[in-house]
Amino acid sequence: DGDAMVLPTRRLLEILAELNAAFPDLQRVSSYCLPRNLAKKTVEELTQLREAGLKILYVGMESGDDEVLRRINKGETWESTRSALLKIREAGLTSSVMVLNGLGGETLSRQHAINTATLCNETQPDYLSTLVVSFPQGEERFREGFGEDFAPLSQHGLFEEIQTFLEHLNLER
């Protein structure tokens, strides 16, 4: 797993050609990607990659709220994610977006849910997954970056946040 979009388009096209030669019945290739790496690619480059066999890009949106994104040091903004997802769509690629329920903690829960739904509404991802935030490297380490005011959501709070998200979500399909 990794962000293949960090590689130059020329190299990605070479890799896709090798995959297609080795696996003649290959149906699709997918990749994770960060919005900031897609910013370095043109729609034309992404279209070339699609024509060479790349079909799905998995984008870890995590949040559509700039304050949450800043606090978790994502290195992305609402606008950088929006731009990347619209570029994916324009190139004819399929987008699969992941958001993290509970990422804003108690303090930023509502704005996280609403702004994330708004970003999804604007970009209309093909697939949308919600995951619950976890702390594989420890909650204390997460707090160091987020700030001491982070209080994780209770189970009830997680359900309320997803309800707020869904109430503001308006996907066309």
Model-derived segments and spans:
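Glycine-rich tight-turn/loop motif centered on a GG-T
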Residues: 69-75, 145-152
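Generic alpha-helix detector with strongest preference for long hydrophobic helices that associate
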Residues: 12, 27-30, 49-53, 62-66, ...
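Conserved C-terminal portion of the radical SAM core fold
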Residues: 56, 79-141, 155-172
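Short linear motifs at secondary-structure transitions and domain/linker junctions
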Residues: 5-8, 151-155
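Hydrophobic residues in alpha-helical segments
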Residues: 38-39, 145, 169
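Generic hydrophobic/packing signal
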Residues: 3, 34-36, 124-127, 148
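Conserved SAM/AdoMet-binding glycine-rich loop
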Residues: 1-90
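Short, well-ordered secondary-structure micro-motifs
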Residues: 41-42, 70-72, 107-110, 140-143
